[in-house]
Amino acid sequence: MQIDKIQIEAGWKEALKEEFLSENFARVKENFLRAKAAGEVYPPNALIFNAFNLTPFNAVKVVILGQDPYHGAGQAMGLSFSVPRGVKIPPSLANIYKEIRDDLGIAEPNSGDLSYWAKQGVLLLNATLSVSAGQANSHSGFGWQEFTSAAIRKLSERAQNVVFMLWGNPAKAKIPLIDANKHLVLTAAHPSPLARGAFFGCRHFSKANLYLAEHGKAPIDWDLNNAV
């Protein structure tokens, strides 16, 4: 990974230019290349920054923070909770769909591809952007956390009226990075069936759209059945 070869949207590249040149990112690259040499890494290189490329910096309306990419073959696509069309919908995403159904009356889609949301301004960001095959959280110590924290901090500083959906304790740990005076921070338990606490009934999707409308922004169409 070299900065001149990293394909990332221009707004994000400018916002994160200091981070890309930092000692931390040098450590990320070193750890990443070592992991690649040792075995299979997900997602494919071209999709590592997919969240930033599908949702330009100046277009972000909502942030949904995940932990790390899916570690099964063909699952990870660089968007938190999302899997490519045709791949079995993972349990956490199935629960997200159930909450949207209960919150907004939207029928559960048969695809796990969330690109439709990303293209409307939903930044689907994992705190860690890579993983070794079959080893959940295997890259959590690579320095990605500091990189994605910088992205959240820059959004908080430069953007206005963004909705941050933080599910589970690792996501909630990012709260200090966000200026709650000019953004909406929504918290709940993680949607995983294994998580403790309440995710169902959080109504984050309707709350997000209400907040966006109150601040003169077009709401998100959460209905993935409308995706072409």
Predicted features, each with a name:
Residues 1-10:
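Generic N-terminal segment detector
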Residues 6, 14, 18-166, 170-173, ...:
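A polyanion-binding, active-site-adjacent surface
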